[in-house]
Every structure is written in C-alpha cells, then in structure tokens.
Design a protein with these regions (language model features):
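Signature aromatic-anchored transmembrane alpha helix within multi-pass, membrane-resident enzymes
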Residues: 18-21, 71-80, 313, 368-404
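Membrane-interfacial loop-to-transmembrane alpha-helix junctions, especially the N-terminal start
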Residues: 7-18, 67-75, 316-330, 385-391
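Lumenal/periplasmic acceptor-binding loop at the mouth of the active site in multi-pass
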Residues: 93-309
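Membrane-proximal, lumen/periplasm-facing interface regions of secretory-pathway glyco-
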Residues: 352, 389-426
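Membrane-interface catalytic loops of GT-C/OST-like multi-pass glycosylation enzymes that act
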Residues: 6-7, 11, 28-41, 92-96, ...
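Membrane-interface junctions at the ends of membrane-embedded or membrane-associated helices
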Residues: 2-11, 50-63, 315-319, 363-389
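Hydrophobic/aromatic-rich transmembrane helices and adjacent perimembrane loops
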Residues: 335, 347-372
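Transmembrane alpha-helix segments characteristic
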Residues: 75-81, 297-304, 317-340
Length: 426
C-alpha cells in the first residue's frame, strides 16, 4: 500500500503488488499440483503485465495506474482485516469453552463450521420437493439408492499421548442422495416439514410415475405455482417483510408466532388498517394488549423512507447512481439472504436479526426522507431553503421520538448485569 501510495519507484511498486497477491494465495486456485501450476502461471503473467517497460509500451487505457493498484490493495487489506475476525473462533475453541459447538480448532473443522455443514445442504436453484423419492439403481438384482460423488475430507487424528505429533487422516465426505423427481427453484424441499408446508399452501399437486424396484407407483409433487406461493407467503412475507414492517410500521407483540393473527404480526396503530390485517385489536386479552413488545409507529418511518428512496432515485444522475448502491445493500442483506437460506416453517426462533443490514440500508432512505421533504417544501410551498429545512427537521423529529417512546420499555436493559458478569468472570 505504501509503495503504490508514494509512487516513487515503479519496479518496487509492481513487486510489492505481486507479492501481496501471491502471499494471500489468490492465484493458487484448485487443489494439489494443478493449483501450484495455475498460481505460478498467473503470477508470471501478472509480473509480465506490470513490468514497467511493458506498461510504457501498451496503450494508456490498458495501463495499471498507481491509483488503481492502491485501491486494489486497500480493498484487499479490508477483506483480510474482515476475515481475520474468524481467528477468534479458533482461539476460543482452543480454549475449550463450555459452549464449543463442532470444536473448530483447525483449518478443516473451521471450514465445516463456516460452511454450516452440521445443518446439511439445501437446494437453491434445482432439486427435490418434500415428496420426492430417492432415485434407485438396480445392481446384481438389488435396488440401491443413487448417490452423488461424496469426495473426502481431512480430520485431526486423536493423539494417544501428549508427545505425539499432530497428524490428519482422510475420511469419506458427506453422502448425498440423488432424487428421481426434481423441480426448479425448490422452496418446499424438506420431507420432515410436509404437514407444515400444507398449512401455508393448499397443495393439490400432480402425480408423477416412479419406478420403485419394478413396482410403478405415483408420487404427488407440488406444482411450480404452489412452490412459488409458499415462497411469497412464508419465506418472503412472513419471514422477511413481517420483520421489516416491525421496524418501520409497528409490531403487535413480541410473542413468537407461526402465522396466528394474535402473535408476532406487524401492525400500524391505525385501527381500520389493522382490522383488515389481523382483526380488531381491542378484542385481544389484556396480557397481549399490554405486551411490552406492542409498538405502533403509524407507518411514519416507512413513509419517510419511501420519500427518501424516491428523492434519491430521481434527484439527479449522481442520485440514481447512489440509489443503486443503497438498493443493492438493501437487497443483498435482505431478500438475497431469504433466497439463500430457503427456510422451512416452524423456525425455533424469530430470525429478524439475520436481516439487520437490510433494515440499516432502509434507514439510510429514512434519513434522506428529510431532504426529500425539504425539496417538496421548496418546490410546492415555494419556501426558502432555510425555513424549509427548519420546518422539515422539526416535523421529521417526531418520527424518532415516536420510535423511542414506543420501544423504550421493551429494550430497556437497566439492572441486567448477567452478560457483563459472565464476561468479567471468564
């Protein structure tokens, strides 16, 4: 970073850049000897391309400037700093703390831990439905379940004495079965949750013939439309937009729900809207009406965020460019996670924490909503900039005041010292 920043010597600058990329292992893609060959070829090609005498001979638009190198190295440094936080997992596991799930004490168990291998695999783009049957192959007169390539993995060998050197052994990898019936974008894939899928979607399905060791049986598969309906009704609406509206419209209570109209839904605090959504809230028992998690924002943060969204998108050319940055932050930390997790019904806990980044992104638009209101006051009320800014700030100040007033009781940590005491004792 220093060499590319000072730009005193182009040779040293190129060497430092190549060494950084090489030492991070970026060019060494693959496994075994092939990764070494690929890495050497990539480093050699990069060194040839960045050589000062080559850079002076090629067209200016193809040259790598010191600024580009510096930016690339800074980005790489930020990535390394971010990934270095994973070292805490290994350090903590090595200390053998009471809670040490999967004991990720070496590079192999750390990979399994980060890959969430203890939770199994979930199909994302193509795979089985909850009613799919394992494909069968006939071998020597027997029906054998068809398995995919399992590969292998390395695990640490248990020591027989403290003086024994560390060693690792190779074991067969995870066994994956192949299914005879598959579908695109499978959202209802878990055979353990079949009754729960049917609670969320009225599944009629369609029959598919299946050869079960010479016996032809019919397997009822959900249709693609039923699959999409579950995606929208449960995974998107219940497991994302419900949490989103908790933060920007209002929350019924903090009791975990599974789709009931009295537990954990989003509300607005506006009676006629809430009556349409979840029924008359005045008919709820007192313990639910007085729940500390009952928070109403009257959709004010949501409205302010939408104003900020449209103001940024239509403000100028620079505004639309900034809008796409915030939008992709909002999407990748929200809906993209929904697509990746492919969650089943009856989760053990509310999962709103998984989408906190998406809510932070929308909060950026909430802040920009103030600028949008200032622009509206100037354009439609013909106000001067300073009076418009003062009036918009005063009006919008009621939004965070309402949020704080509603959520203070269910977020008050006064007198709670368990977390601090555990940390101090440890």
């Amino acid at each position: 970073v220093y060499e590319s920043y000072t730009e005193k010597n182009k040779t040293r600058m190129a060497i430092s850049f190549i060494l950084t990329i090489a030492l991070l292992g970026i060019p060494f893609y693959g496994h075994g000897a092939s990764s070494i060959v690929i890495g050497i070829l990539v480093i050699a090609a990069l060194g040839l391309y960045l050589a000062p005498n080559i850079q002076t001979k090629i067209k200016e638009k193809w040259r790598i400037s010191a600024r580009t190198m510096n930016t690339a190295l800074l980005c790489t440094m930020m990535i390394v700093i971010g990934y270095s936080s994973y070292a805490l997992i290994v350090i903590r596991s090595t200390a053998n703390t009471p809670m040490d799930q999967n004991s990720p004490e070496d590079i192999f168990t750390l990979g399994e831990y980060l890959g969430r291998e203890q939770y199994g695999t979930r199909p994302l783009f193509y795979g089985p439905a909850f009613s799919s049957k394992v494909a069968l192959d006939v071998k020597d007169g027997y029906c054998i379940p068809r398995q995919s390539e399992a590969g292998s993995k390395f695990v640490r060998k248990e020591k027989t004495s403290p003086d024994e050197k560390d060693s690792y052994i190779e074991l067969p990898g995870r066994v994956e079965y192949e299914y005879a019936q598959n579908m695109l974008f499978p959202r209802m894939y878990s055979s353990s949750h079949a009754p729960l899928y049917k609670q969320w979607v009225d599944i009629k399905g369609y029959d598919v013939p299946y050869d079960q060791c010479g016996e032809m049986v019919m397997v009822n598969m959900p249709t693609q439309w039923e699959n999409i309906k579950f995606f929208f009704s449960y995974q998107l609406n219940f497991m994302y937009w419900r949490y989103f509206m908790w933060n920007f419209a209002g929350r019924q209570n903090d009791i975990q729900g599974s789709g009931e109209i009295e537990h954990g839904n989003w509300i607005t605090g506006i009676p006629f809207i809430d009556n349409l959504l979840v029924g008359n809230q005045e008919l709820l028992p007192q313990d639910l009406k007085n729940n500390k998690g009952h928070n109403v924002f009257y959709c004010l943060p949501l409205i302010l965020g939408l104003i900020g969204l449209f103001w940024q998108a239509y403000h100028s050319q620079r505004g639309i460019q900034q809008f796409w940055v915030v939008f992709f932050l909002f999407f990748m930390t929200g809906i993209a996670i929904v697509l990746y997790l492919n969650q089943t019904p009856a989760q053990p806990r509310e999962r709103d924490y998984a989408y906190a980044g998406s809510f932070y992104a929308f909060a950026i638009w909430v802040g920009m909503g103030v600028a949008g209101i200032i622009r509206m006051l100037r354009d439609y009320a013909k106000m001067q900039e300073l009076p418009a800014a003062v009036l918009a700030s005063v009006l919008c100040l009621f939004v965070p005041i309402q949020i704080a007033g509603q959520t203070w009781d269910d977020h008050d940590r006064s007198g709670r010292f368990v977390a601090r005491d555990f940390g101090q004792n440890y």
